[in-house]
Amino acid sequence: MGFHNIVIGSLDPMTEAGKTYTDWLDKGYAASMDYLKRDPQKRVEPAQALAGSRSVIIASVSYYSEPVAVPPPVAGRVARYAVGLDYHPTIRAKLREYAALIEEEVGRPFLRKPYTDDVALYEQALSARHGLGFVGKNSLILGPQLSGSYNFIAELFVDLELEPDVPYQGTCGKCFRCGDKCPTVAIKDGALVDSNLCISFLTIENKEGIDPNLRPLLGEWVFGCDICQEVCPYNSKPVTTPWPEFRPESGIGHYMDLLDLLTIKDDVDFRRRFEKSPVRRPKRRGLLRNGLVVLGNHLAYGHIETEKIVSAVATFAAEQDDSMLVEHAAWALNQCGESSARVALQSIADAHAGASIGPTLARYTEESSFGVPKPVSSSGERKDGAL
């Protein structure tokens, strides 16, 4: 089937993992992801995934790939898991094929249900309990047999009685590169990630505006983030995905053309462009918000295409009635010290002077707040090393 690793798991409750999950929730680290807060006990009881199941087969496959094309002149980076096609239907189909092979082997039909990141289940803890790897400080499953952390994890619940695999005994040791390099300091003690600060949450699951203090730290990430994986020693020799569905040529690739992104007309156009891509998750509004933040960061760098960016952002804002997107567009222009950006920003402020967002836009046009860029590196880190 092309899976890199397959282990067998029991359906016993994950008591210790439940304590970790509750601690994560109690600290408010789930942010606005209310679906993760509902019935937390259910997430550490694998048996609830399929009534009548007796075992779970846990599989992993790498999604890693390197860029194969030159990025557009004005680009935003896409997390590696999303460069190809949506993994949910692809992996579920493979699990069904695998189940059919097992059925031939056992000589009888059996109850089964495939899942991949779409069931109320603490997947990392279950995978670690049965030898797929261990939960690293960035909360991802790590281990030499995985060749790093760039892996999709999936489960096939069955009513077959199978012998479970034992845990893998591994740790990160004293290494904390993921936490040290995280631009927003989202990685906390105890292998807990504060979603309120995580770039992946901010650009994917977050439905609201992005905190202006965090925007410069996104760097060039328009969808997701791989920084904590890129710096991890376990990822020093990643295995390229063997599945063509997850390769960049099958999807949008590693970079997104941000000027083209601003031309998306409506939700219908958005769905057409990204029909089978994971980047549909934040919807049109969220992806445009992300693009405006990255464009602002490009302007802060002094991008070679500054005038094109200013013109595109100004045109976009002039056609918008969504106050969140207008504010993010104004913020982006405010990162630029060019006179053209000042003119464009003033035009936006005048057009929305009577709206609730008017005072915010007016503040951006003030001399004290205009043209004071916050330089960041491509990874999202402030160049002065401060938050």
Give each language-model segment a name.
Residues L295, L299-G302, L333, G337, ...:
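Alpha-solenoid repeat junctions
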Residues F370, K374-P375, S379:
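Intrinsically disordered, low-complexity segments enriched in serine/proline and basic residues
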Residues D269-R273, H303-A318, E338-A349:
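Amphipathic alpha-helical scaffolding segments comprising HEAT/armadillo-like alpha-solenoid repeats
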Residues M1-T171, A351-A353, T360, A386:
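Auxiliary alpha/beta "docking" domains used to position bulky ligands
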Residues F3, P13, R177-S200, K207, ...:
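Iron-sulfur cluster-binding cysteine motifs and their immediate structural context
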Residues I252-D266, R272-R285, R289-H303, T315:
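Alpha-helical adaptor scaffolds
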